[in-house]
Regions:
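Acidic/His-rich structured neighborhood in mature extracellular/periplasmic domains
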Residues: 2-144, 151, 157-160
Length: 161
């Protein structure tokens, strides 16, 4: 990770896109760190910390000792910016009453955050049934802003589709 120009460029363009849709979005300070293989992205106080040790590639030998193959495939350079956006947006738009929500509502909340990350990235990185449900909903309801989508924690309107 001696050169992170590609990551910086994608972070900048992604946050520029987000600012178009969410003008009040605070732009975080971003730093890189070496962790203890226990966290990939650390978010707090308008900062994002990228633990580079969690993005050393799917062939990094130490990962095989501690992680499942499904986890290892996400531990690549290509996942850094999507993960930064995902965890940062989750910190700003948490799900209220998480414990009392159904699994479907929880999945839709994550799908909503991932859908917005895809918009910010400018390409479809996150793909799931729930991201598709949000995409269908937003295509049918073009008057709903991305900011309002993120602020709304009522998923009954999507579940009924």
């Amino acid at each position: 990770y001696a050169n992170m120009d590609d990551i910086n460029k994608l972070l900048n363009s992604s946050f520029d896109r987000l600012k178009v849709y969410i003008p009040t979005l605070p732009i975080p300070q971003i730093y890189a760190q070496i962790g203890a293989l226990d966290q990939s992205i650390v978010v707090g106080n308008q900062t994002i910390g990228i633990s580079l040790d969690k993005y050393l590639g799917k062939d990094y030998p130490l990962y095989k000792k501690y992680y499942y193959p499904s986890q290892i495939k996400t531990m690549t350079r290509d996942n850094i910016v999507p993960d930064c956006l995902n965890f940062y947006l989750l910190s700003l738009y948490p799900m209220h009453d998480f414990e009392s929500r159904t699994q479907l509502e929880r999945d839709l909340h994550i799908g909503k955050i991932m859908w917005v990350c895809n918009i910010a990235l400018g390409y479809k990185f996150f793909k799931s049934r729930y991201v598709n449900m949000i995409d269908q909903y937003m295509n049918k309801n073009k008057s709903i802003s991305i900011e309002n989508l993120l602020k709304n924690n009522d998923y009954s309107y999507i579940i009924k589709m």
